[in-house]
Amino acid sequence: MSRIEALPTHIKAQVLAEALPWLKQLHGKVVVVKYGGNAMTDDTLRRAFAADMAFLRNCGIHPVVVHGGGPQITAMLRRLGIEGDFKGGFRVTTPEVLDVARMVLFGQVGRELVNLINAHGPYAVGITGEDAQLFTAVRRSVTVDGVATDIGLVGDVDQVNTAAMLDLVAAGRIPVVSTLAPDADGVVHNINADTAAAAVAEALGAEKLLMLTDIDGLYTRWPDRDSLVSEIDTGTLAQLLPTLELGMVPKVEACLRAVIGGVPSAHIIDGRVTHCVLVELFTDAGTGTKVVRG
């Protein structure tokens, strides 16, 4: 018997009753989820995440999943004997590296998640920006020691084909998005998944953006455990941005972009918690940091 099955019936009923206001608020709304970290590699967490997506779909909520795959790309490059290079925290993406990224993101990571979700019903569809030009890229550079530096086939989201994406949602599908997209000349670029998730959430008019991480939420004075915040506004967060740990910066920038762009709230949540999405969306306590306009 599982721990959930062992709970008294009245406790189960109380949990469901607590979820009702949130279910009503989110019914018919789009929720964009950036999937990554431990939730993408631990088998129990992967299966729980897939079940969460199916749960949302069956509650009349429209999840859209945007996933990364940096560690998996690195592992495949090593297996193939291809040297990887990083500049300014970004992977230098040569045509050879891009071929590996496409294979891993769409052919491995995306496929695995699609299959896990579809174990619950015919819901998930794996896509990239190349499909029906769902989104396009514009090449980007990074600043290293004050100098603009080329990092190859790495882009930012330029435009999102909102109508095509919403067609999938309206058909009851769960888009599972691998962040590869062509530029204006048809040259495919790899896009940071945090950046892409924010752009998709903004374009679709999502009700929420959820960013799965491997920490409890946002710490304003890391590693001070007492500095974890449950809610923060965009003005305060923007001022805090230069002081944050490097790994948190893309996630915080994504939250800022989404909320300033019209998404009512963005959430940095602990992907190490089983069913973290349901905990954040449907309980009063939540499991991370909520970012709101302010």
From Swiss-Prot:
EC annotation from Swiss-Prot or TrEMBL: 2.7.2.8
Site (Transition state stabilizer): 34, 251
Enzyme class: transferase
GO cellular component, one term: cytoplasm
Species in which this protein is naturally found: Mycobacterium tuberculosis (strain CDC 1551 / Oshkosh)
Annotated binding of substrate, by residue: 69-70, 91, 190
Identification of the protein by name: Acetylglutamate kinase
Keyword Nucleotide-binding listed: yes
Chemical reaction(s) catalysed: N-acetyl-L-glutamate + ATP = N-acetyl-L-glutamyl 5-phosphate + ADP
Keywords (A to Z) from UniProt: Amino-acid biosynthesis, Arginine biosynthesis, ATP-binding, Cytoplasm, Kinase, Nucleotide-binding, Transferase
Subcellular localization, as worded in the UniProt entry: Cytoplasm
Family note: Belongs to the acetylglutamate kinase family. ArgB subfamily.
Organism domain of life: Bacteria
HAMAP family: ArgB
SUPFAM superfamilies for this protein: Carbamate kinase-like
Record function comment: Catalyzes the ATP-dependent phosphorylation of N-acetyl-L-glutamate.
Pathway noted in the entry: Amino-acid biosynthesis; L-arginine biosynthesis; N(2)-acetyl-L-ornithine from L-glutamate: step 2/4
GO annotation terms (biological process): arginine biosynthetic process via ornithine; L-arginine biosynthetic process
InterPro entries: AceGlu_kinase-like_sf, AcgluKinase_fam, ArgB, Asp/Glu/Uridylate_kinase, Glu/AcGlu_kinase, NAGK-C
Any one GO molecular-function label of the UniProt entry: ATP binding
